[in-house]
């Protein structure tokens, strides 16, 4: 009985640790351990990319794009179970942190970098 209880407790603890917890004040530089979460649902945020010499490398999946209007400054915040993106210029997105939805109004600006193009 004790082994079963400890097993269930361990399972619950592992699930809780994978979810975002606590509050996050508005920031353009979210914690490193949360980048995968934030960038999965709004990948054009500037903090998701390392941009140099006109090209940008995605910090999560390593994809490369040309730097253009796709990469935008944005801030993120979390309060209770609400995760919010602020893309400035009056563009906001709010979602449940535990039931997130991808959202990207700039997806049409994305231009993949191709090795042969120079």
Swiss-Prot record:
Segments traversing the membrane: none
Family under the similarity heading: Belongs to the asfivirus MGF 110 family.
Induction: Expressed in the early phase of the viral replicative cycle.
Renumbered ranges of motif Prevents secretion from ER: 115-118
One Pfam family linked to the record: v110
Keywords annotated in UniProt: Early protein, Host endoplasmic reticulum, Signal
Protein localization: Host endoplasmic reticulum lumen
Function noted in UniProt: Plays a role in virus cell tropism, and may be required for efficient virus replication in macrophages.
Signal peptide range: 1-18
PROSITE patterns, per the entry: ER_TARGET
Name of the protein in its database record: Protein MGF 110-6L
Organism from which the protein derives: African swine fever virus (isolate Tick/Malawi/Lil 20-1/1983)
Major subcellular location class: host cell
Single GO cellular component term: host cell endoplasmic reticulum lumen
Post-translational modification: N-glycosylated.
